[in-house]
Amino acid sequence: MSDTLRAETQQTPIDGLLKREFFLIGCLGLAGLVVGGLLLGLQWLAQAGLIWAFICYQTKRRLPLNRPSTDAPLYKNLGWANRLTLLRAWFIAAVAGFLFQAWPEGPALSWLPGMLYLFAAVLDRVDGFVARRSGQSSILGNDLDTVSDAIGL
């Protein structure tokens, strides 16, 4: 993040509705990981949870960038494109839970990491399209897309 944007994010007050929406998405993501952890084990939950926590940290840090440009006002909500980007990041976190694990038993679990990554790849293409179509492209969305790309590699 550039120094100008960093200064901008420190000075911008965040709307309570935007904070609540982000908190709800973070909690839903964590709940989904806990359910997955019950099925896949504690190591999977720890690894996926660590990546999801990092994604939530990066998102919270960048919430003041939920605007089309630095001189524009903040959007009141995340918008569908940013929600899709966060869903994509959640899929990537779920895939990361399978790293350093024994090969999953059974055909369904063996294919699960690949299917999760496929969903993430499809959402990578869709989120930008949704942002442009809905007229809610944002600096936040661009940054989250880059963070998700980096983690997904």
Go through the PLM ranges and name each one.
Residues M1-G114:
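Topogenic membrane-insertion module of multi-pass membrane proteins
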Residues L116-L153:
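Acidic (Asp/Glu-rich) catalytic motifs at the cytosolic membrane interface
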